[in-house]
Design a protein with these regions (language model features):
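Ser/Thr-rich, Pro/Gly/Ala-heavy low-complexity intrinsically disordered linkers and tails
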Residues: 17-76, 303-313
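An edge-strand/N-cap motif at the start of beta-rich repeat modules
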Residues: 69-102
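Repeated scaffold domains used in trafficking and secretory/extracellular systems
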Residues: 70-71, 108-117, 145-158, 193-206, ...
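Conserved beta-propeller blade signature
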Residues: 78-82, 89, 121-125, 131, ...
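Structural motif
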Residues: 87-90, 129-134, 173-179, 218-225, ...
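Short loop/turn segments that connect beta-strands within beta-propeller blades
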Residues: 92-96, 134-138, 179-183, 228-232, ...
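A short beta-strand motif characteristic of beta-propeller blades
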Residues: 97-106, 139-144, 184-192, 233-240, ...
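Blade-level signature of beta-propeller repeat domains, shared across WD40, Kelch, NHL, RCC1
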Residues: 261-313
């Protein structure tokens, strides 16, 4: 399904609004105005002038790029990314803090999805172009012009190519690969069972590959599937995620994270033998916030610390 850029889409600037949500194992706390970047009302990460209140870092450290290693701790930084049509956000999957990275610059606008490889190299698509994007600044560099999908992820090395990770996506139910150097698109396979991407795809090294879909025997709107990253076909359906138009999907430590067209953020976990989604409240969001995509590094932990997570076949 293609995103439609309508009058309800808000274009945000860097520091225009930042959400943070508190921790908790089963209960997701809400978002507060706090930006890891901090700053004055008129500076990067600043606030106040736009009516959303002042932003400060509360003494926190600026986050490195997604999936990178914190030098002082030697541990992975649990960052995943989401975006509206024009603005890049980041979510710390441990603290549940979300901050604005900034508006996309360099010519990319109406961005329809993002994908991040194991080294935190990130790519975004619009309907007419493929771009590389800097996760620290949201600056885009054009790679190629063509027709590109709104379901985008890298899959691990050895899946479609023995030597490199492959950038993949869905056009409806058609599974495709995109060359990150030339932008060339190649058909790989298809999703059967009457499902079509709604949607977004995310894949993890040593873990699963997941897709949000519509249709199928459940008349999904939306459901979460495990798919085979070699063929793009169905492995299993987990059922409804209780949200429609889940245009953004990311993953960290055994749980998925959904970002929908209505501006909602939620976690997706496996609880007592069934899929369970927990909304992450967004108090005082900007009017008409709409998420159009999300992504996480393929080197994200595939399971929780206790080994739990969404079960795979």
């Amino acid at each position: 399904m293609r995103r439609v850029l309508g009058l309800g889409v808000v274009v945000l600037t860097a520091g225009a609004v930042v959400f943070a949500c508190g921790g908790g194992s089963n209960k997701e706390a809400g978002f507060a105005a706090s930006d890891a970047a901090g700053g004055s009302p008129d500076g990067p990460g600043g606030g106040g002038a736009d009516g959303f209140g002042a932003f400060s870092d509360g003494g926190s450290t600026t986050f490195p790029e997604g999936g990178s290693v914190a030098p002082e701790a030697g541990t992975p930084v649990a960052l995943i990314y989401a975006h509206s049509a024009d603005t890049l956000y980041r979510l710390d999957a441990n603290s549940k803090q979300v901050a604005v990275v900034g508006p996309f610059t360099g010519g990319c606008s109406s961005v329809i999805d993002i994908a991040i490889d194991s080294s935190s190299n990130a790519y975004v698509t619009t309907e007419t172009d493929l771009w590389k994007v800097d996760l620290t600044t949201a600056a885009c560099t054009n790679i190629a012009t063509g027709s590109y999908p709104n379901s985008l992820s890298f899959v691990p090395k050895g899946t479609l190519d023995p030597n490199v990770e492959a950038l993949v996506g869905y056009n409806g139910s058609t599974y495709i690969r995109i060359n990150t150097t030339t932008g060339a698109v190649t058909n790989v396979g298809a999703l059967t069972g009457g499902y079509t991407s709604s949607g977004d795809i995310v894949s993890v090294i040593g873990g699963g590959t997941f897709l949000t879909v519509k249709g199928g025997k459940e008349s999904c709107d939306d459901c979460l599937l495990q798919i085979d990253p070699k063929t793009g076909d169905l492995v299993q359906s987990y059922g409804s995620v209780n949200h429609a138009d889940v245009f953004g999907l990311a993953f960290w430590a055994g749980a998925a994270y959904g970002f929908d067209n209505g501006g909602d953020v939620f976690s997706i976990a496996w609880v007592n033998g069934a899929l369970s989604t927990t909304d992450i409240p967004v108090p005082n969001p900007p009017p008409n916030l709409s998420f159009w995509g999300a992504g996480s590094t393929t080197s994200a932990p595939p399971t929780a610390a206790d080994g739990g997570g969404i079960p795979l076949q």
